[in-house]
Amino acid sequence: KDSIDKSTKGIQEEIFSMRLIPARFLFSQLRRIIRDISKELGKDVYFEVIGEDTHLDKEILDKLSAPLKHMLKNSLDHGIETPEERKKAGKNAKGFLKLELYQKGEDIVIEVFDDGRGLDSKKILRKAIDFGIAFPNKKYTEKEIFNFIFIPGFSTSGFVTEISGRGVGMDVVKNNINELNGTIEIESV
């Protein structure tokens, strides 16, 4: 019986390891998206990825694909400025976008960072008030304000483009992450 249990456990571990694939398969898709969208937007961006050799369950990697694509598109469209805007702000004309994936204990941590303009909390709050999800006289923390972007239909964009402005996206990102029993946090410096 003991050897059967060990054999069964060995088979289970083998099957599980066959489901694990390196994140590089997803990252190569993301590189193409970054290249195409930055070209379309007239933005020059250096895209750094860390953690390509981290192995994840294929199903989890598939479920992370859409949220990561959306977050990176948002960074390009809303965060990273055009080369001209960056020069005026005293920055390098080439923007910087980083995606890092690593394991921390049992958790998988994914960080998306860009050196763009950051989130405009005043603009988000104004839009939230206009959208009817915030009160004009109430004081909100920055975290509370940033969480408005996860409300379905919410957008700070003044117009619709192929990339953004439809109010569809960050709520889906949050839902996808929640389905994986994950959390999402936004910081703006």
Residue ranges and their predicted role:
Residues D44-Y46, A134, T183:
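Residue-level detector of anion-binding/catalytic polar loops
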Residues T156-S157, G167-N181, V189:
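Conserved glycine-/histidine-rich ATP-lid loop and adjacent helix of the Bergerat-fold HATPase_c
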Residues I186:
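Contiguous mid-protein beta-loop-alpha structural module that forms a pocket-lining wall or clamp
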